[in-house]
Amino acid sequence: MGRMEFALDLSIDVLRRTPGALREMLSGVAEPWARGTEGPETFSPFDVIGHLIDGEETDWVPRALLILARGPARFEPYDRFRHQARNAGRSLESLLDEFARLRAANLELVRSWRLTPADLDLPGQHPALGPVTLRQLLAAWVVHDLGHVAQAARVMAKQYKEAVGPWVPYMPVLTDHEVPRS
């Protein structure tokens, strides 16, 4: 299996697509699809969008700015459930709109930095992981996005776990294991 080296332009290309991919998947879906979860303290697709908005405001770009300031770049701990109280009573459509707007602005800002390879190697300090580089932070942003796109699809699929009856063993999205060979 191949592995990619980090490339900022390829990363931005994925990051710019995330709002549209999630909008295509979620816009206009019924509440049971949007609000279903995998159990206590797990995210629904609605929560995924709220969490991504919170990350746009408090995580990826603010942490990158700390690194680029070349000062003490110790990141504040991140509360992954902070978005829930703020988004109570909001519509999924309003969250999708806000996420798209914030992401576009953040990517415009990142492009304006004109990052060099030396910039990408600048250090930061994650509260749990220890030393990280700007390159690692930006790569993690991409993987975080892809993980949450997959999570939204997985959570939606699991709403039909009982409905598919005997097909469960052939649907790894429902069981988190490989498909048996037939």
Label every PLM stretch briefly:
Residues 1-6, 180-182:
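Basic/polar N-terminal segments that are highly enriched at the extreme N-terminus
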Residues 4-33, 54-66:
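Alpha-helical bundle segments that constitute or directly flank the non-heme di-iron/ferroxidase center
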Residues 8, 15, 41-45, 53, ...:
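Hydrophobic alpha-helical segments and helix-packing faces
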Residues 11-15, 19-27, 85-90, 134, ...:
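Small-residue-biased structural context
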Residues 18, 23, 80-122, 132-151:
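Acidic/histidine-rich alpha-helical segments that form the ligand environment
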Residues 25, 29-32, 71-74, 113-116, ...:
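A short secondary-structure junction motif
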Residues 34-78, 121-182:
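Short, contiguous alpha-helical
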